[in-house]
Amino acid sequence: MLTTGSIGAGIVITEGVTATVQHAETPSVVIRHRAVDGTTSTISRASPPLTSIMEQLGVTASIITECHLPIGAGFGLSAAALLASATALNRLFTLGLTPWDIARHSHEIEVEHRTGLGDVAAAQGGGRVIRHGPGIDARIERIFDLPESLFSVSFGPIHTPTVLGSPSQMEKVTSAFPSASPCDARDFFTKSKQFAEKSGLITDSVKKVFQICEKENVPAGMTMLGDGVFAYGKKAHEVLSPFGKVYEFSVSSTGPGIVKDNL
């Protein structure tokens, strides 16, 4: 599966997933969401991909993941959770895995569970990313040309496995792929919007936001795969705010790492 996956462009963002792992007699997973006021809520007590990463690494642990962004809304949180958990498990059990090993295991599991095709490859590092081939070993450009904040609104999830498992939908996605890589940041947003429209993935809610963003000259694209919009620049927050809760983040400078080590 190392050469299986998608090609394309995206942005690795600072808002990701934090994974806390501990030794345990039986494997367990808890998925939590942290609200703006600091309160946490449990979204799920099961995650087949995270259970699979423990099985693949040959370890038994409890994993608690936490994020601020909405799950299943196109922010790449499935890939982030896998990379974060694998990185933490590697440290806890002294597995001696390299960053490439961690990315390989995470990518294989994401493809197997159809939670994504290229997010792990992108999130190995930071930046505005252009993936020129499928898999984690393909050539990846990492460009740091978006110094200001990014903002996003989300109207709900799009079930990624359903889209990836639909031959007809994937045929539309393939035919909508741009003929050339974006030449700069502005072109990235233009191609992102065009791809959403031509692929048939765009929703009515996203169309409405796009119309306002275009009117206000705010660069914007659709979160993939999710019913939402991300936008860039000083006016972006103001333009998005009438449509719901606005999330703010920046372009990440790095990939996964250890935040706190209690060993």
Outline where the language-model segments fall:
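ATP-binding N-lobe of GHMP and related small-molecule kinases
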Residues: M1-I71, S241, S250-L263
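Solvent-exposed alpha-helices and their adjacent loops that cap or buttress functional pockets
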Residues: M1-T3, G10-I13, H113-T115, A121-A123, ...
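Short beta-strand scaffold segments in enzyme catalytic cores
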Residues: I11, V17-Q22, D119-A123, R128-I130, ...
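Short, hydrophobic/aliphatic alpha-helical segments
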Residues: G58-L69, R104-V111, S205-E216
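DPxDG-like acidic metal-binding loop motif
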Residues: F75-P99
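C-terminal nucleotide
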Residues: D137-L263
